[in-house]
């Protein structure tokens, strides 16, 4: 197991390096400048600004300088938020996205798995049809449609919950964005769990357990659930990526000060340094999470330790 974990960590290094390289050159070679706007700056002023940020250096010089900065944990200066470095901006916004993303992810896993198991155990009953009907609805409706609907129903009409803001991450401010962000993944996980659980319940070892007279609850929790969760575990990597990218829309709709909204503002303002750093950060988190999923998969199913 230790060798497997070490190998996955080593495999992540070149992937991250390729991500950094591609992202850097795409940002640097993109047309336009972070300092061009509605008002055209005099050439002398533009030259001084570019010299300050070393944007007039050869592209390879900029690349190796950026790698050196990253090696020291420095994302560099922000081109638009002049009083803050990118590190400062990430440090203030990342906890918001991390708290919202973690809450949405665990909500999706818990409710999705529970609904899928219930649907599998009650196959071809009204419970099964209800869960699958709701799951299909949750899959086809995108989060940018769900989010305003939740605001309209629970904030404007019923006045039960606030329609935006963060307020330090208080629970009532998290409920609507958390539900909007996780709904599609609850539905997908429920469908995956149902199909996998039905397949496992028809396996020979489950028939043997039933023939021995074991209680159904014990059969489900100790024998059926573990193998049934393997497809769900495989889906967690894409779900994590989807929650990260989906948070950009959700944070903008609900006015949350997270990295999603920061990324959108950076892209609109052509703050290439900020956008590049957030791209690398999200990519690194995705690579790390996928490595963790692979390790968990190996723990549950030792057959994949190759």
From Swiss-Prot:
Keyword terms, alphabetized: Cell inner membrane, Cell membrane, Membrane, Peptide transport, Protein transport, Transmembrane, Transmembrane helix, Transport
MF terms in GO: peptidoglycan peptide transmembrane transporter activity
One annotated GO biological process: tripeptide import across plasma membrane
Bilayer-crossing regions: 12-32, 100-120, 138-158, 170-190, 230-250, 280-300
InterPro entries, alphabetized: BPD_transp_1_N (IPR045621), MetI-like (IPR000515), MetI-like_sf (IPR035906)
Subcellular location: Cell inner membrane
Gene3D superfamilies membership: MetI-like
Cytoplasmic side: 1-11, 121-137, 191-229, 301-306
Protein family membership: Belongs to the binding-protein-dependent transport system permease family. OppBC subfamily.
Subunit structure: The complex is composed of two ATP-binding proteins (OppD and OppF), two transmembrane proteins (OppB and OppC) and a solute-binding protein (OppA or MppA).
Protein name per UniProt: Oligopeptide transport system permease protein OppB
Organism encoding this protein: Escherichia coli (strain K12)
